[in-house]
Swiss-Prot record:
PROSITE patterns: LYSM (PS51782). Induction: Expression is induced during the initial intracellular biotrophic phase of infection. In plants, chitin acts as a microbe-associated molecular pattern (MAMP) that is recognized by lysin motif (LysM)-containing plant cell surface-localized pattern recognition receptors (PRRs) that activate a plethora of downstream immune responses. The gene is ELP1. It comes from Colletotrichum higginsianum (strain IMI 349063) (Crucifer anthracnose fungus). Secreted effector that enables the plant pathogenic fungus to manipulate host defenses for successful infection. Binds chitin oligomers and polymer with high affinity and plays a dual role, not only in the suppression of chitin-triggeredimmune responses, but also in appressorium function. Does not protect fungal hyphae against plant chitinases but suppresses chitin-triggered plant immune responses. Forms homodimers in a chitin-independent manner through interactions at the N-termini of EPL2 monomers. Homodimers are further polymerized in a chitin-dependent manner. Belongs to the secreted LysM effector family. This is Secreted LysM effector ELP1.
Length: 170
């Protein structure tokens, strides 16, 4: 009787049988092939999440929203068409890229100015919604301390829409 016939008979009666298996041998990898295997299998991939609609509520900032959705301030600003990432409106609907692989938190932020005066510029600025001393100084290329010095007695934390501040002119 052949082994194959024996297995056929055992299968008919519902008995499981297994042939003895040869012990498999695994080739020992060389250092180069082991390194290639490790680097090929251990490189993480990033799959960003979907872009969602988010409605701004009281207390929201792009920093808070970006942290909530694993995004970047500038990723959200760019996707939402925001030119001033320091100013959001209640009820504003943002496009928020979620789980961004490389969050961008700097490219959309204006750099701090370094000039002490504005050459031939306006001597005053009327405060509008969203203005701060820092943002006004940034927009004019001024060092914020130069703007503060030109406005002695003005508390930068108490600015109101319509207030007029001095701009240091060269």
């Amino acid at each position: 009787m052949q082994i194959s016939e024996l297995f056929s008979i055992l299968a008919v009666v519902g008995v499981a049988a297994a042939l003895p298996q040869a012990t498999p041998t695994t080739p020992t990898p060389t250092s180069a092939s082991a390194a290639a295997t490790i680097s090929a299998t251990s490189s993480p991939t990033c799959x960003p999440g979907p872009v969602i609609d988010y409605t701004v509520v009281s207390g929201d900032t792009l920093t808070i929203i970006s942290q909530r959705f694993s995004s970047g301030i500038c990723n959200i600003a760019d996707a939402s068409g925001i030119t001033n990432p320091n100013f959001l409106s209640l009820g504003q609907v943002l496009q928020v890229p979620t789980y961004v692989c490389t969050p961008d938190n700097t490219s959309c932020l204006a750099k701090e100015g370094s000039d002490t005066c504005v050459e031939g510029g306006p001597a005053t600025h009327t405060i509008v919604a969203g203005d701060t001393f820092f943002l006004v100084a940034q927009s004019l290329g001024l060092d914020v301390n130069a703007l503060l010095a030109a406005n002695e007695g003005v508390d930068p934390l108490l600015l109101q829409i319509g207030d007029v501040i001095n701009i240091p002119v060269c």
